[in-house]
């Protein structure tokens, strides 16, 4: 189970990294075009909505990563240890 969790963790970290990079690029684009009028205001509004959704998803991904890390690092109780302590 631990190996499966480590694989899941790696996939989540990869997805979160990719999403964070896209967020940074979108933020940079929005910042650069904040006062330029070469883009339709409706497009800017939609990009800001997209950014909000992406940020929410990124937050959820990072929370899932932390939960999975804790699960992977949680000490395991061995059945033999339980029998010895009884």
Residue map of PLM features:
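Extended, charge-rich alpha-helical interface modules
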Residues: 1-86
């Amino acid at each position: 189970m631990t190996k499966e969790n480590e694989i899941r963790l790696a996939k989540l970290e990869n997805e979160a990294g990719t999403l964070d990079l896209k967020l940074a690029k979108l933020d940079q684009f929005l910042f650069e075009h904040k006062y330029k009028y070469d883009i339709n205001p409706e497009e800017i509004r939609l990009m800001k909505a997209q950014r909000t959704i992406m940020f929410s998803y990124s937050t959820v991904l990072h929370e899932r990563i932390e939960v999975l890390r804790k699960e992977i690092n949680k000490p395991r109780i061995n059945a033999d240890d339980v029998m010895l302590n009884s």
